[in-house]
Regions:
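Beta-strand-rich interaction surfaces with strong enrichment in secreted/lumenal proteins
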Residues: 25-26, 86-92, 175-181, 224
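Extracellular carbohydrate-recognition regions
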Residues: 19-53
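Secretory/extracellular carbohydrate-interaction modules
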Residues: 70-159
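Short, aromatic/His-centered strand-loop micro-motif at the edge of beta-sheets
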Residues: 149-188
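Extracellular glycan-recognition surfaces and repeat-rich motifs
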Residues: 45-75
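Extracellular beta-strand elements of beta-rich domains used
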Residues: 40, 237-239
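Short tryptophan-centered beta-strand motifs in secreted/extracellular beta-sheet-rich domains
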Residues: 40, 100-102, 186-193, 198-200
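Short, solvent-exposed beta-strand-to-loop segments that form ligand-recognition rims
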Residues: 203-222
Length: 247
């Protein structure tokens, strides 16, 4: 019975993978000037780093993320409610088209992510623009600006009666490709963003691709690294300005 179930799951996964759009084999971005790099070996963190959501620590030449806001706590005794949220650390590096390369390691964490935000943009919750997320079983790209974080769609997530309508609005705004990402092992993540397209590679292999309008947001004012669960690590981050690669 277990063998039959395994074969069914394998067949289902293969069928889903076959329906996904092809990922470009070649880079979609051409690197230009290097905007930022950090190997986390300095005694003092670079000034561009800042706290967003606890908890991150510079530890043994790495950036360690641990989700400590891991449960919803209702308001009580004059204290505001606390909503569970991934740990997030921000990098003040303005970009439009870019290549972000960073080594990641999931040591129990459910995911690690690279996100682009524009806090001055008011059309999406907290100025979220787009996101690349790596889990042990898949790589996801999300157009947040025109997808799940767009103000009206974000509000719909709080109303079960709007579930079907929200699902329709989210079509084409995010995609997940299956992957096998080993925990406790370093992986090289590269996120290319050019125009309204994002391409992700993992350990040099194409891992995900999405073309969606929100990705083309012209003023991505910051990059944020995220970790869900406990613990995730980042190292050797580099950020380049970029332009479309030659066809």
């Amino acid at each position: 019975m277990r063998t039959i179930l395994a074969l069914i799951l394998l067949g289902t996964t293969a069928a889903l993978a076959a329906e996904l759009p092809a990922i470009p084999n070649a880079p979609i971005a051409k690197k230009k000037e290097l905007l930022f790099s950090d190997d986390f070996e300095a005694a003092t963190p670079a000034k561009q780093w800042h706290k967003v959501v606890p908890t991150f620590a510079f530890e043994k030449g790495m950036l360690k993320g641990t989700q400590t806001r891991d449960q919803n706590i209702p308001a009580a005794e004059g204290k505001p409610a606390v909503t569970a949220h991934a740990a997030v650390h921000g990098l003040e590096i303005p970009t439009k088209d870019s290549v972000v390369e960073v080594r990641i390691r999931l040591d129990g964490a459910t995911f690690a992510s690279v996100e682009f935000d524009d806090r001055k943009y008011t059309g999406a919750h907290y100025g979220h623009i787009c996101l690349a997320q790596v889990r042990t079983n898949g790589v996801t790209i999300i157009d947040q600006r025109d997808g799940n974080m767009r103000n009206d769609i974000y509000e719909m997530s709080k109303d079960p009666a709007k579930k079907a309508e929200r699902a329709q609005l989210l079509k084409g705004r995010q995609i997940t490709y299956p992957a096998k990402v080993e925990s406790g092992v370093w992986h090289t993540l590269v996120v290319e963003t050019v125009g309204d397209a994002m391409r992700v590679t993992l350990d040099g292999k194409p891992a995900a691709y999405l073309k969606s309008s929100g990705i083309g947001h012209a003023t991505k004012s910051k990059i944020e690294l995220g970790v869900g669960g406990k613990d995730g690590y980042f190292d050797d981050i580099k950020v380049w300005n970029a332009e479309p690669a030659a066809p």
